[in-house]
């Protein structure tokens, strides 16, 4: 179930303040965050945000297509290495 429309999209205040500060000064630097739950706003476009995946910070460059999605969608938390291969030939 999605978020109620009357509430509007969510973004952590500390992250929004950092983005607004960079937009005012015109700087482009990597912003490190643990806030995977924050929605990407149009003000984020062009910035690189390092999102924590539980082990390291994954740099995510924000483009126009990402607006409306959550930051956590672009930093996967699980690494899939494939299922164990069948060794039918070696068992015989």
From Swiss-Prot:
InterPro entries: Ribosomal_uS19, Ribosomal_uS19_bac-type, Ribosomal_uS19_CS, Ribosomal_uS19_SF. SUPFAM superfamilies: Ribosomal protein S19. One of its GO terms (molecular function) is structural constituent of ribosome. GO terms for cellular component: cytoplasm; small ribosomal subunit. Protein S19 forms a complex with S13 that binds strongly to the 16S ribosomal RNA. HAMAP family: Ribosomal_uS19 (MF_00531). Belongs to the universal ribosomal protein uS19 family. Pfam families: Ribosomal_S19. It comes from Anoxybacillus flavithermus (strain DSM 21510 / WK1). Disulfide bonds: none annotated. This is Small ribosomal subunit protein uS19. GO terms for biological process: ribosomal small subunit assembly; translation. Keywords: Ribonucleoprotein, Ribosomal protein, RNA-binding, rRNA-binding. PROSITE patterns: RIBOSOMAL_S19. The keyword Ribonucleoprotein applies.
């Amino acid at each position: 179930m999605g978020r109620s429309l009357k509430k509007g999209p969510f973004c952590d205040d500390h992250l929004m303040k950092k983005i607004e500060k960079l937009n005012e000064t015109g700087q482009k630097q990597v912003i490190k965050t643990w806030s995977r739950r924050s929605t990407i706003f149009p003000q984020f476009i062009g910035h690189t945000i390092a999102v924590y995946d539980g082990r390291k910070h994954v740099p995510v460059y924000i483009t126009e297509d990402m607006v409306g999605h959550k930051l956590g969608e672009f930093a996967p938390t699980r690494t899939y290495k494939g299922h164990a291969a069948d060794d039918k030939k070696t068992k015989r």
